[in-house]
């Protein structure tokens, strides 16, 4: 039997070799955490390399994602479909082993990590999902949801502010199945961290309500194993295991220094490390006995088979719950979804209401929520303003995790990355909310959702200068454009309750990308529509008002400015002008339509166009051309009543008509 140290050295060797072959990467963390990884993965982690998507597997997150050769080595050694050639292709174009772990590339990668602090935050989301699913589905004698979430994180993760947001909430929610390992090696890129990171981390986490196991020797397998056993035994609090490690362990001349953090060791140092570790094998060569000791395929298959037997017994005793669990974990919508939601939208069109689109959003939640037990909502301490709670909302707490609504507190970034974790875990359709202005705090987590192609629905209310007296600190200007310009992001700014419901429906159906739903504070007039127009809302842009024959002018508007465009249309039409109004709640959805549809809505021959939106003006040139005009924002807002601000910045019928006449002259 191979010694534990040699099993860990296999990780060190592969990590050194992979980084060296790529001529870039981070060997220090994988070499420093190899002993911890060996104990966790071989003695504790419940997983099946032959089915990386087994629903009740333990989750493992490498929050310090720069140490990616660690997880690639673990996946390869354990028997996942990640070959030695894949490891040799580390950091190369179209490889399964990119520089930072990316969800969807190599099997067994649970989340994309790299921006520090977001991995631990995703893990908090996964642990919340596990606790909530267990509370909703487990029955006495039938624990079908019962798994741990393990995280590796470094000093950088703990310095990032998002780690405070996430770990504070994790303590409050009593996430007893969350176990984090702090790689306490005292080194970051700039050198020894005591000059910029002198926190008492154990006391910090104790203050959060965590179970803290301090001063564990990260190179002592028995000490590591005992710490993990103690962590698993603590069921009411998350655990932080503080592991003291040597970065680059095994490198005789670079271990313990920043020299091995983010650069290849070099051939000479790798040779010296091999001698120091007693690793006598060639680069990328793993002996058969090491492979055999690491191989988790048979053990994993046995664990999943045992769970399948448990689930079969559960299904026999609780057939309805078992069917519902399978539906939700598979990410399937209820069978009656399409018919029920289409009827809801038709009824909204037939019963006009002039309400704020944030209220329209709440009405959509009320209607759709009754169909979706998988909804998991929340807000960053703005529920009464975002209107994200509905009659079926039940708060999720440490004592009762069967709820479907998370009070995130004032933690926009944490909320958004936690929701990424909930979505990655599966079993829920998660949404969060804040003011549109404060998506700025959460921007990178939404970008990560788009990069990973996961469902993260964000409700952004108070969407413009219409916010009024709170002033420019709270009035978004450039935020909508930045969301629209994010690849794989679906952004909607509806003009009334019907467009709002359609936006919600599509966001719920869109499993492979995040959605930003942008709503107003102020009341908006509902627009009359035909059934065909209602159907065309889903296309992102459609003709709302039209003239006989070819228009001479097209007004394009979104959200609260649609009624402004309609008022100008009516005045111009009464004066004999041939005008069309295009409502464009989602530019990305419109851009995905075929050329014929886009030409039918915005004919190339009609060059006189005005875009109207209380957001940054520059975005709209792609739709109006340089010969068109934009009534939009070119500065920050002001503190004043909303009506005065709309007048000040030109969002009036008079100004739209004036601009139109100048363009037509």
From Swiss-Prot:
This is Transketolase 1. Keywords: Calcium, Magnesium, Metal-binding, Thiamine pyrophosphate, Transferase. Its cofactor is Mg(2+); Ca(2+); Mn(2+); Co(2+). The gene is tkt1. One of its GO terms (biological process) is pentose-phosphate shunt. The record marks 26, 261 as: Important for catalytic activity. Substrate binds at residues 26, 261, 358, 385, 462, 470, 521. The active site is at residue 412. The keyword Membrane does not apply. InterPro entries: THDP-binding (IPR029061), Transketo_C/PFOR_II (IPR009014), Transketolase-like_C_2 (IPR055152), Transketolase-like_Pyr-bd (IPR005475), Transketolase_bac-like (IPR005478), Transketolase_BS (IPR020826), Transketolase_CS (IPR049557), Transketolase_fam (IPR033247). Mg(2+) binds at residues 155, 185, 187. Thiamine diphosphate binds at residues 66, 114-116, 156, 185, 261, 438. It comes from Vibrio cholerae serotype O1 (strain ATCC 39315 / El Tor Inaba N16961). Catalyzes the transfer of a two-carbon ketol group from a ketose donor to an aldose acceptor, via a covalent intermediate with the cofactor thiamine pyrophosphate. The keyword Calcium applies. SUPFAM superfamilies: Thiamin diphosphate-binding fold (THDP-binding), TK C-terminal domain-like. Binds 1 Mg(2+) ion per subunit. Can also utilize other divalent metal cations, such as Ca(2+), Mn(2+) and Co(2+). Binds 1 thiamine pyrophosphate per subunit. Its EC number is 2.2.1.1. It is an enzyme of class 2 (transferase). Homodimer. Belongs to the transketolase family. GO terms for molecular function: metal ion binding; transketolase activity. It catalyses: D-sedoheptulose 7-phosphate + D-glyceraldehyde 3-phosphate = aldehydo-D-ribose 5-phosphate + D-xylulose 5-phosphate. GO terms for cellular component: cytosol.
């Amino acid at each position: 039997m191979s010694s534990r140290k040699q099993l860990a050295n296999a990780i060190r060797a592969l990590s050194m070799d992979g980084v060296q072959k790529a001529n870039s990467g981070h060997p220090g963390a994988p070499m420093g955490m190899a002993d911890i990884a060996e104990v966790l993965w071989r003695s504790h982690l419940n997983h099946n390399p032959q089915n990386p998507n087994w629903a009740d597997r333990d989750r493992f997150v490498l929050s310090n994602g720069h140490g990616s050769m660690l997880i690639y080595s673990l996946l390869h050694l354990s028997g996942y479909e990640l070959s030695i050639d894949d490891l040799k292709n580390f950091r190369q174009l179209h490889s399964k082993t990119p520089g930072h772990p990316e969800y969807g590339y190599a099997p067994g990668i649970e989340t994309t990590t790299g921006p520090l602090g977001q991995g631990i935050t995703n893990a908090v989301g996964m642990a919340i999902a596990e606790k909530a699913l267990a509370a909703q589905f487990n029955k006495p004698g039938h624990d079908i949801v019962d798994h741990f979430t393990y995280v590796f994180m470094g000093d950088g993760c703990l310095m990032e502010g998002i780690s405070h947001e996430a770990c504070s909430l994790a303590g409050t929610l009593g996430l007893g199945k969350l176990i984090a390992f702090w790689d306490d090696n005292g080194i970051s890129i700039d050198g020894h961290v005591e000059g910029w990171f002198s926190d008492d981390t154990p006391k910090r986490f104790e203050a959060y309500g965590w179970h803290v196991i301090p001063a564990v020797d990260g190179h002592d397998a028995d000490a590591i194993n005992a710490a993990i056993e103690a962590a698993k035994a603590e069921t009411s609090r998350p655990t932080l295991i503080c592991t003291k490690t040597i970065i680059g362990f095994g490198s005789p001349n670079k271990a313990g220094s920043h020299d091995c953090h983010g650069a290849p060791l070099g051939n000479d140092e790798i040779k010296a490390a091999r001698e120091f570790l007693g690793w006598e094998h060639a680069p990328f060569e793993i002996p058969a006995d090491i492979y055999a000791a690491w191989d988790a395929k048979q053990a994993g298959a046995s664990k999943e088979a045992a769970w399948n037997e448990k689930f079969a017994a559960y299904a026999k005793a609780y057939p309805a719950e078992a069917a519902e669990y399978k539906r939700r974990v598979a990410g399937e919508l209820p069978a009656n979804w399409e018919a029920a939601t289409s009827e809801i939208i038709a009824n909204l069109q037939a019963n006009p209401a002039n309400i704020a689109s944030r209220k329209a959003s709440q009405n959509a939640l009320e209607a759709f929520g009754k169909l979706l037990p998988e909804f998991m909502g929340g807000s960053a301490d703005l529920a009464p303003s975002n209107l994200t709670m509905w009659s079926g909302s039940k708060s999720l707490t440490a004592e009762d995790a069967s709820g479907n609504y998370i009070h995130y507190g004032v933690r926009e970034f944490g909320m958004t990355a936690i929701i990424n974790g909930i979505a990655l875990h599966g079993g829920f359709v998660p949404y969060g909310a804040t003011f549109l202005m404060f998506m700025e705090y959460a921007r990178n987590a939404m970008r990560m959702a788009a990069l990973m192609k996961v469902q993260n629905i964000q409700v952004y209310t108070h969407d413009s200068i219409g916010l009024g007296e709170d002033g420019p600190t709270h009035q978004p200007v450039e935020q909508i454009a930045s969301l629209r310009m994010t690849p794989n992001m679906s952004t909607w700014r509806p003009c009334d309750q019907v467009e709002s419901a359609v936006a919600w429906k599509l966001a719920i159906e869109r499993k492979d990308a995040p959605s930003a739903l942008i709503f107003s504070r102020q009341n908006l007039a509902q627009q009359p529509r035909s059934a065909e127009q209602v159907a065309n809302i889903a296309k992102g842009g459609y003709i709302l008002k039209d003239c006989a024959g070819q228009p001479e002018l097209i007004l394009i508007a979104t959200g609260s400015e649609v009624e402004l465009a309609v008022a100008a249309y009516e005045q111009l039409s009464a004066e004999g002008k041939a005008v069309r109004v295009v409502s464009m709640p989602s530019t990305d959805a419109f851009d995905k339509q075929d050329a014929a549809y886009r030409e039918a809505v915005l004919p190339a021959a009609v060059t006189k166009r005005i875009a109207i939106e209380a957001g940054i003006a520059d975005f709209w040139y792609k739709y109006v051309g340089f010969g068109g005009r934009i009534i939009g924002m070119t500065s920050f807002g002001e503190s004043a009543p909303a009506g005065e601000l709309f007048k000040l910045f030109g969002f009036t019928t008079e100004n739209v008509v004036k601009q139109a006449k100048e363009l037509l002259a």
